[in-house]
Amino acid sequence: MNSPLPNSYRSGPDDRGHFGLFGGRFVAETLMPLILDLEKAYAEAKIDPAFRAEMDGHLKHYVGRPSPLYFAERLTDHFGGAKIYFKREDLNHTGAHKVNNVLGQIMLARRMGKPRIIAETGAGMHGVATATLCAKFGLKCVVFMGAVDIDRQEPNVLRMKALGAEVRPVTSGAATLKDAMNEALRDWVTNVHDTFYCIGTVAGPHPYPMMVRDFQSVIGHEVREQIMQLEGRLPDSLIACIGGGSNAMGLFHPFLDDPEVAIYGVEAAGHGLSKLHAASIAGGKPGVLHGNRTYLLMDGDGQIQEAHSISAGLDYPGIGPEHAWLHDVGRVNFLSATDTEALDAFKLCCRLEGIIPALEPSHALAKVADLAPKLPKDHLMVLNMSGRGDKDLASVAEHLGGQF
């Protein structure tokens, strides 16, 4: 399935929210007025200098941006090839990239006069970021989280509760991220008058994929500036993990029209691509889920299959529609890493860099381990260190039999 090559890879979506054959808005009739209101409010906010100035102020003084671009010297020496930089999104307030997007959406919710915020969460980082900003701005917060994820991400559940959020366990389906998103959408339909749905990734109906991408693009814009200061030129390659894909899109988007920059997205191969996994590009086909058309894990009857990853944040049977399009037009190379490869990369990063990475970016780091040794020493590679791994220590210890 090939989409025509565009003049610019950065111009999408069209006015109906399509990236080539992907995206759009497939939603219940009751939600359509909300979606259109949101689109209008975002279009107005985007060109309002006061909105931008307020957001920049919060990003600097509350989130702690810009996040550093860090030369991973010992990992670079260990692999003996490309010069590796980490974009340290793990150092943001709340410990991941999620807060960049949540800040923008919560500011939009306030602008729209919505006092109640709902969110879905997998690894808990989007839930924590949402609970954090609801506390800061005095808004009611309800977070939907799969029961399986509640068990494996307990530290984040406690953080959300400490911040005043109500955490609602979801027991339907596989009780993970997809199911949490289903429940959040149901709640939104029921409470349209006062509720804003803060989606955590570049998925959902238009304008969410575009809006989340725009709020996360601060990552890539900072990298452009920082790498020019450090190296005097653009990087040769970018690499990031992909579940829905917001951290990756935030890094990739500002570089899409730079043909000299190779771009790699890393999906979760779970137990392997022939077994249980969460690699929608590698093992999926086009379909509709959560309001947009994209690559999905489906059976022969078109039913959504359960995804699996050791990482709760990548455990989703779809991918953002813009990523699906970028795959089809050949601009982004999609790879996948297994649970075991991610665990090995996790341990390596801890021991060589003194950085405990989240299991999500550990998948990207696993592919750095494959790519970097084959590249020349002057090749500049930037990995998005999208979150810190405190939340994963119990899960990692369990998988490693307690032996770090």
Curated annotation (Swiss-Prot):
Q: What class of enzyme is it?
A: lyase
Task: Name the pathway.
Answer: Amino-acid biosynthesis; L-tryptophan biosynthesis; L-tryptophan from chorismate: step 5/5
Q: Which reaction does it catalyse?
A: (1S,2R)-1-C-(indol-3-yl)glycerol 3-phosphate + L-serine = D-glyceraldehyde 3-phosphate + L-tryptophan + H2O
The UniProt entry's GO CC annotations, sorted and at most eight, read: cytoplasm
Modified residues annotated as N6-(pyridoxal phosphate)lysine in this record = 98
| Molecular functions (GO terms) | tryptophan synthase activity
Return the PROSITE patterns for the record.
TRP_SYNTHASE_BETA
Entry EC number(s): 4.2.1.20
- Entry superkingdom: Bacteria
Keywords of the record: Amino-acid biosynthesis, Aromatic amino acid biosynthesis, Lyase, Pyridoxal phosphate, Tryptophan biosynthesis
Q: Which cofactor does it need?
A: pyridoxal 5'-phosphate
Task performed by this protein: The beta subunit is responsible for the synthesis of L-tryptophan from indole and L-serine.
Record-stated family? Belongs to the TrpB family.
This protein's assembly is summarised as: Tetramer of two alpha and two beta chains.
- Its name, as the record gives it, is Tryptophan synthase beta chain
Q: What organism, scientifically named, is this protein from?
A: Rhodopseudomonas palustris (strain BisA53)
Q: Which gene encodes it?
A: trpB
